[in-house]
């Protein structure tokens, strides 16, 4: 009985460890917030949002 309980506990521990590794290595998809390029799947964090490419947003200033 003790061997069976230890085996089940060991298997559950391995499953929990694999789930933890999978969650910590997840990257952020395009359109979601980020804090650095390494958070994004495509490695472009632009204005705290994951983007496929980083372009300048807004209009140019015009001088009169």
UniProtKB/Swiss-Prot annotation:
Residues 61-64 form a propeptide. Residues 1-26 form the signal peptide. Expressed by the venom duct. Keywords: Amidation, Cleavage on pair of basic residues, Disulfide bond, Secreted, Signal, Toxin. The keyword Secreted applies. GO terms for cellular component: extracellular region. The modification Histidine amide is found at residue 57. Pfam families: Conotoxin_I2 (PF17557). It is found in: Secreted. It comes from the Eukaryota. GO terms for molecular function: toxin activity. Disulfide bonds join 27-41, 34-46, 40-50, 45-54. The cysteine framework is XI (C-C-CC-CC-C-C). Belongs to the conotoxin I2 superfamily. This is Conotoxin Im11.4. It comes from Conus imperialis. The lineage of its organism: Eukaryota, Metazoa, Spiralia, Lophotrochozoa, Mollusca.
């Amino acid at each position: 009985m003790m061997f069976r309980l230890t085996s089940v506990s060991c298997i559950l521990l391995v499953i929990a460890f694999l789930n933890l590794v999978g969650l910590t290595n997840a990257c952020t998809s395009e359109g979601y917030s980020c804090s650095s390029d390494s958070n994004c799947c495509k490695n472009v964090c632009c204005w705290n949002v994951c983007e496929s490419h980083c372009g300048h947003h807004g209009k140019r200033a015009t001088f009169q």
